[in-house]
């Protein structure tokens, strides 16, 4: 594979127009933010309610297993990011290894357009977080924002307006001040991390008695701390039951360190070398320690029963954050925890907006997507890509809020990303076979094959349990439509390029410009 920068006949232009604004800290922040630790900690109860059984579901062990399954992907992204530090990094090496048709169609389905329903999901997660925080602080008027749209008392219109307004504001920031967009993510991540630390310390200081007093103080008929703890009689760990939660960790956390590689041409210094392994380690601790704290303070039996109790989860938004706020002895502490929860979730949204525009830019550079999507303003922002993302995502927020009412209605669409990551692993293995020697070759091939196997398994889990993972018409229809759209678009663009006298496939044999 050549490494020269080809002329304008191959790529749309000779430079992306983006600048190197992303430090190592920024890269870690955007990776961990995109790994959705805030959502993973706050939405677990809704998934526990959907499981066929919660007997033996251990979230700490589940997080450990999921992190272990992510190790091959970590190796792949670390090694390949050093070789392809470009905009849309994993798309670049996958399309160069597996060919333009496979690379273009799978990326359009699995990342470029899949990110939009994911952002819609996260936008609604932010709304639910704001509503739950308001309730925990004593503002009962915010109940409508905290409840899923299919639950009596919910306010789908308010959820749509708030979620869409927040999304519009973040898109405008990235259009007008793209450098500020990266700095906001780092700020949100830092504030969110502080909130998680405060929550953990608050729970540890409150102890078992604090949890008992909080639950009993809710005055829920027939529901006390003791009754919840006694209602669970199963083991503390069952492998089969815990493995049912693997798609949950895949939905929100461990696969998503493609964030920093997607802005590869904007990374400064050593950011492209170390951001992936550091991000995986940081995300593991941020997710696992809170779950472990809940088990330690509240007890495994109580925590499992509470996270699968419909009244606590649906009506009181029970999760790690609300429990910590509930046991807090002062308003300031509760507010700090609530703020951390909200901004940690907003950070996911903030970077999702950036990453989708980078994949659009990369694919338009290869002449697969329309050239207008590659337009970069004088401020260094891919404006048209942002506006397209804005239009589609706002529509999906509305569909999820009004027609389906639950976050899980969009879960199924994330299956497309599992397919994408499987092909990314396969692409790395093919690249290793063709271009590497010795230890590097063996490492890339083995890690790539293992990554492909892990995500094939996760795709199967999504399909095998549609009732848990949002196997709705909206989700599956979106995945199928985007795949066929990609296939048709590739055929059309190739036909147009052939008539114009240049071969579109040449782009997939060269490394694109920075």
Residue ranges with predicted function:
Residues 92-95, 99-100, 137, 141, ...:
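TM-loop-TM module centered on a large, flexible mid-protein loop between adjacent transmembrane helices
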Residues 44, 61, 193-194, 199-207, ...:
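A generic transmembrane alpha-helix motif of multi-pass inner-membrane proteins
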Residues 142-153, 157, 186-334:
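Helix-loop-helix junctions that connect adjacent transmembrane segments
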Residues 47-63, 138, 144-156, 178-188, ...:
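Transmembrane helix-loop boundary segments of multi-pass membrane transporters
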Residues 1-60, 64, 70-75, 220-224, ...:
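Membrane-interface "cap" regions at the ends of multi-pass membrane proteins
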Residues 22, 158-222, 255, 279-284, ...:
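Membrane-interface loop-to-helix entry segments
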Residues 46-47, 71-79, 83-167, 345-359, ...:
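Hydrophobic transmembrane alpha-helices that form the core helical bundles
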Residues 14-21, 89, 176-187, 255-291, ...:
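Hydrophobic, small-residue-rich membrane helices and short re-entrant helix-turn-helix hairpins
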């Amino acid at each position: 594979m050549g490494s020269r920068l080809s002329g304008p006949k191959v790529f749309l232009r000779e430079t992306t127009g983006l600048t190197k604004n992303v430090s190592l800290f920024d890269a870690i922040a955007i990776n961990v933010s995109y790994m959705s630790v805030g959502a993973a900690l706050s939405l677990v109860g809704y998934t526990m309610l959907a499981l066929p059984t919660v007997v033996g579901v251990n979230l700490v062990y589940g997080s450990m297993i999921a992190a272990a399954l992510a190790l091959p992907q970590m190796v792949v992204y670390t090694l390949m990011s050093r070789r392809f530090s470009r905009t849309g990094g994993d798309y670049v090496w996958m399309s160069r290894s597996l060919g333009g048709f496979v690379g273009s169609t799978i990326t359009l389905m699995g990342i470029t357009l899949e990110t939009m329903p994911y952002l819609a999901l996260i936008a609604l997660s932010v709304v639910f977080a704001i509503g739950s925080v308001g309730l925990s602080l004593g503002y009962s008027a915010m109940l409508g924002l905290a409840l899923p749209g299919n639950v009596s008392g919910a306010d789908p219109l308010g959820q749509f307006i708030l979620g869409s307004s927040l999304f519009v504001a973040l898109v405008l920031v990235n259009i007008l001040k793209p450098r500020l967009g990266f700095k906001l993510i780092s700020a949100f991540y830092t504030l969110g991390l502080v909130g998680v630390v405060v929550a953990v310390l608050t729970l540890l200081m409150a102890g078992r008695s604090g949890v008992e007093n909080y639950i009993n103080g809710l005055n829920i008929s027939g529901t006390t701390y003791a009754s919840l703890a006694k209602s669970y009689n199963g083991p503390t760990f069952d492998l089969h039951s815990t493995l049912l939660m693997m798609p949950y960790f895949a939905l929100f956390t461990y696969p998503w360190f493609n964030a920093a590689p997607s802005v590869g041409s904007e990374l400064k210094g050593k950011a492209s070398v170390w951001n992936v392994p550091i991000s995986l380690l940081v995300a593991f601790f941020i997710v696992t320690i809170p779950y472990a704290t809940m088990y330690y303070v509240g007890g495994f039996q109580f925590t499992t029963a509470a996270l699968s109790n419909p009244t606590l989860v649906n009506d009181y938004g029970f999760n790690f954050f609300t429990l910590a706020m509930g046991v807090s002895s002062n308003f300031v502490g509760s507010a700090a925890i609530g703020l951390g929860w909200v901004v940690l979730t907003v950070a996911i949204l903030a970077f999702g907006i950036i990453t989708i525009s980078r994949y659009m830019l990369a694919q338009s550079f290869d002449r697969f997507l329309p050239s207008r999507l590659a337009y970069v303003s004088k401020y260094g922002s891919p404006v048209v890509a942002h506006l397209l993302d804005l239009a589609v995502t706002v529509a999906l927020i509305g569909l999820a809020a009004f027609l389906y009412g639950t976050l899980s209605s969009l879960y199924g669409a994330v299956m497309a990303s599992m397919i994408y990551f499987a092909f990314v692993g396969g692409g790395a293995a093919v690249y290793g076979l063709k271009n590497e020697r010795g230890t590097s070759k063996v490492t890339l091939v083995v890690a790539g094959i293992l990554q492909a196997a892990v995500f094939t398994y996760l795709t199967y889990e999504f399909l095998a349990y549609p009732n848990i993972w949002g196997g709705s018409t909206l989700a599956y229809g979106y995945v199928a439509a985007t795949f066929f759209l990609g296939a048709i678009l590739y055929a059309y663009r190739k036909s147009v390029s052939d008539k114009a006298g240049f071969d579109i496939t040449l782009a997939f044999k060269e490394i694109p410009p920075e």
